[in-house]
Regions:
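Conserved FAD-binding catalytic core of PHBH/FMO-like flavoproteins
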Residues: 5-114
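Core beta-strand elements of the Rossmann-like FAD/NAD(P) dinucleotide-binding domain
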Residues: 1-5, 9, 123-126
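Acidic active-site catalytic centers that drive phospho-/nucleotidyl reactions
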Residues: 8-11, 131-132, 151
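Basic, amphipathic juxtamembrane/active-site segments
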Residues: 141-154, 158-161
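C-terminal helical "tail/cap" subdomain of flavin- and related membrane-associated enzymes
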Residues: 78, 158-200
Length: 200
């Protein structure tokens, strides 16, 4: 394949970013998050489509996951606890988070770690980064997804303009610098604050 530019939009473990030698600066949160899918009638109990549960121990986000009664609860726990016994501890979290003892149906659960990181540059020559390849943050508030969509939208305008001669190549430098600045000054701090508030 021969091309003038490459866009790395290949996720938080981006091979493109690594091959360019760009560092991924930031930190990993000490907690483990557990994402769970369940069937339970939250709407009948007055829940909105998205809910933040503020609690020092049982902090969580509860959101509707589809149009057929599937909901997602994502909560945090000590990463030192063994992954093998998550299903046992999950029951305790549900007791604290669900408003009553009516039965629920657990569909799936998955543990994961959360990072707040940003590439040292969103451009390396003819390679540009977008989305999670460029930056990652915790999922609370959907800011990572929104930021990635905005990256794609702006790069989707800038790159064709440069390729077709309607704009100078430095437009791509401006894309890289501005999107990185917005993540470091706005998106990243807002996401970190969302997580901090959950644990109050």
């Amino acid at each position: 394949i021969h091309c003038r530019y490459v866009v790395g939009a290949d996720g938080g473990r981006s091979t493109v970013r690594q091959l360019c030698g760009l560092s991924f600066e930031g930190y990993t949160h000490p907690e483990r998050l557990v994402s769970t899918n369940l069937r339970y009638d939250f709407e009948a109990r007055g829940f909105a489509r998205a809910n933040f549960v503020l609690d020092p121990v049982h902090w969580a986000v509860i959101v509707i996951a589809d149009r057929h009664g599937l909901w997602r609860i994502t909560y945090g726990e000590d990463s030192a606890l063994p992954e093998e016994t998550i299903s046992e501890r999950l029951v305790e979290h549900y007791r604290a988070l669900l408003p009553d003892r009516d039965p629920y149906k657990l569909e799936a659960f998955a543990p994961f770690r959360v990072h707040e990181r940003c590439a040292s540059s969103f451009r390396a020559g003819r390679v540009l980064l977008a989305g999670d390849a460029a930056h990652v943050c915790n999922p609370f508030g959907g800011l990572g997804l929104t930021s990635g969509l905005l990256d794609g939208n702006l790069l989707g305008d800038a790159l064709p303009a440069v390729i077709h001669g309607a704009a100078h190549d430095d437009l791509l430098d401006r894309y890289a610098a501005e999107r990185r600045r917005v993540f470091l000054e706005v998106t990243g701090p807002a996401a970190a604050e969302n997580k901090r508030r959950l644990k109050e």
